[in-house]
Amino acid sequence: MKETLKQKIIAELKNRITGDFDLRDEKDAKGNIQIWLKLFNRKDILHVAQVIKDFGGRCVIISAYKKDDHHVLVYHLDIDGILINVEVELFDNTVDSITPILDSANWTEREFKEMFGIKLVGHPNPKRLFLDESIAEGILGEYMPLSQAMNGAATCCMWEKIESERHKNEH
């Protein structure tokens, strides 16, 4: 049954995506199906989101990271237990919001906007979730690589740098 659903999802993705893309699917040792999709036209994320919605799916989370001189987003989407991972490179640091299509993307889009300074086009509620308005968007990426932040080794130092920068901007 999941195999049939996977084939329908893949067919619909191929039908709706307008730009170039790479697509592969795999099944792990426990039988979990994953679809991996790399979009070369960032606008196609809207078509993918519509496919997910049409199949009754949701946005689980969106990962953001820095690659060379630009950001990359990986959308982790779910349709009835089938995980669809969609990679989009942002060479202009801008992406269309999928929240108007998939409300489940709301907070995770706002989080990457705030933490990485990625510009969201068309988000219905782009207010911040965590950082005070006086702190610049994307500031965390300027002071500390994610790998250091994740191990918690330098949290105090990071916040000291952010507070110092904020106080400089106030004067």
Residue ranges, per PLM feature:
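Terminal low-complexity/charged segments
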Residues: M1-H171
